[in-house]
Swiss-Prot record:
Record protein name field: Prostate collagen triple helix protein
Gene expressing this chain: PCOTH
Region of interest (Disordered), ranges: 47-107
Entry's Gene Ontology cellular component terms: cytoplasm
Cellular localisation: Cytoplasm
Length: 107
């Protein structure tokens, strides 16, 4: 019986509903202007800053990856790792080739 009463929440739910009713009514009543005010500034303001990921992510996303994103990803680690790897061994491996032109070029 007590569980049913608790589940039904006659006294607790009644109180909660009573408190929620006026709160919801007050929120709903003021919601007409309150939600419009906070929504207007929050929609354009918050979406511009926190939700701006949509706008900046779109243009900035492709711009970043296209410029620094793409080159840094494939070019940065790809080019330096690829050419630097074989270049380093090529330099010391073939010191006669680069040494000859480097020596006369330096002096």
């Amino acid at each position: 019986m007590w569980i049913l009463s608790n589940l039904m929440g006659t006294s607790e739910e009644g109180n909660l509903l009573s408190t929620v009713s006026p709160t919801v009514k007050a929120l709903f009543g003021k919601t007409r202007v309150s939600p419009i005010f906070p929504f207007s500034p929050r929609s354009p303001f918050q979406p511009l800053i926190p939700r701006t990921p949509g706008s900046p992510w779109g243009p900035v996303g492709p711009a970043s990856p296209l410029g620094p994103g793409f080159p840094i990803g494939p070019m940065g680690p790809g080019k330096p790792v690829g050419p630097k790897g074989p270049m380093l061994p090529l330099g010391p491996s073939g010191p006669v080739g680069p040494t000859s032109p480097l020596f006369p070029f330096c002096p």
